Amino acid sequence: MQSWLESYHRAQKAALDSVPLAQVDKLVSLLAQCLREDRQIFVFGNGGSASNCSHFATDLGKGASDKVGKRFRIISLNDNVSWMTAISNDCAYEDIFYYQLQNFGRPGDLVISLSVSGNSPNCVKGLDWAKKNGLKTVALVGAKRGRMAEIADEVLVINDTHYGRVEDAQMTICHMLCYAFMEQPAIAK
């Protein structure tokens, strides 16, 4: 077991080392711009990526907002079960994000989607709608990149295909984004 744990630990370090810090820095700038311009930020994903989106929305919306003195307008589209079940029941599961974006998204807003494969149909459809309607789009994906990487304006690739390691690296990126504002609130100006 020790050997397996060491191997997993090495692979996780490699996944974290693959995080493109220049792209993370660019995303910090996009978030700061959204804050200054009072833009809405939408995040969404499935499974573990959905959990990361929820966590990110909480940390940015509460923790980072408390530090910078202005509120980030961020919402995780996978948190409203009533919306998701109504849309998936009446339309299709792949429509759950883009339908919500139709109601709430406006040109200039920011959409960030997390997916290990980059091919989740609901994430692809949400990003595609957002881009076609003037929202800024970001895909945070694993090494397979997928369709999302072809659609998004900005792409952050974690160079691994293992779901656990990519999801852990996603959360590390989300924490970097939040703590950039918590620990250096002047960047919000």
Kindly give the residue locations of the regions a language model identified:
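Short, glycine/polar-rich helix-capping loops at beta-to-alpha or helix-loop-helix junctions
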Residues: 140-152
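Generic N-terminal amphipathic, Lys/Arg-enriched alpha-helix
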Residues: 1-19
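Glycine-centered short loops/turns at secondary-structure junctions
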Residues: 38, 108, 134-135
